[in-house]
Amino acid sequence: MISVNGGDVYGHDTIGAFIEGRNVTLSDFSISKYLVTRDLYFKVMYDDKDVNAWPSRCEYNQTYRGEIMEGEKDSLRPVESVSWFDAVYFCNRLSKIKEYEPVYSISDIKRNTVYSIISATVSQDLTKNGYRLPTETEWEYAARGGDVTVEDWNFYYSGADSENAGAAIDSGMDAVGWYNCNAETGVTTRRIPSTMHGSHQVGLKKPNRLGVYDMSGGIFEWCWDWEHAISTGSTLDPVGPDSGGKKVLRGGSWLHGWAIYCGVRLRLSSEPQTSTDYYGFRIARSK
C-alpha cells in the first residue's frame, strides 16, 4: 500500500473531480501500489462458502484471455470480470483475513449461478480501518500524484504527459500504460491489432509520482461512487450520492476506447452488476 497525504485542492479543471469552483479537502489515505491480481484474488476468495466467487477466473485460459505475452506471469495479471459487488465483497474478505474492521455492510446477496454477485445491499463505514474501494476523488488525486504543487498534477496521464494528449492514438501512453493501440506489444501502432494479449502483468510500465502503477490504461477500475454530476462548492472527503444507477470506473483499458480515455480526469460508468474482461479494481484504506 502507498501512503497518500491528503490536502486541499482548489479546482480549476473543466472535467473530473476537481472542476473550477470546487474546493476539496481530502484526508490522508493509502492506495494499493498495484491492481488486485488474479493470484491475490484467488488466495482471498478460493475457500469462500457464502458466495461462489468463481476463483477459476484466476486460472489461465488462452481461449478466454488470449496468449500471455512472453515473460509475463498470468497470476500477476489483474483480476478481471469482477462486478462492483464482487470488489466490495473481496475488500471485506481481505479485511477479515488481515484482522481489520470490515468497512462494508453487505446483505441480501444475489448471484449469477455461474460466478458473480449481481445484487446486494451495501453501505460503508469509513471509521473502520479495513480495505475498501477508493472514492472517485481519491482515485483521481492519487492518479495525479497527490501533490498539486508539482507539474505531474496537470499531466494528462498518470505519470506522463504528451504533446498528443487527448488524441485517439498517442505513443505518449507507451511509458505508463496499455491501451488498444499498444496492447499487443507495448508500442503504439497506427491500428488496433487484430489479435491482442488482453490485460498484462501489473507493474511493467512506469509508475506515477506516488509510485502507483497502471492508473492509466490496463483495465478500468471500480470506484465507490455512484455516477453523478460533480458540483461546485467546498467539500470534505466526498463519497458521492447514496444511490444511483451506475458506479464510476476510472483509468481506461487495453480494449475499451482510445488513449484519450486513459486520461486521469475522465470517467466511465457501468451498472454495479456488470462484469467484463476489462473491469477490475485496486484497494484503499482510510487512516
Predicted features, each with a name:
Residues 1-5, 10, 128-131:
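GGW-centered surface loops in extracellular recognition modules
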Residues 2-3, 30-35, 78-81, 132-134, ...:
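Structural recognition of the beta-strand scaffold that forms the well-ordered cores
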Residues 25-166, 173, 228-229:
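Active-site microenvironments of metalloenzymes and redox enzymes
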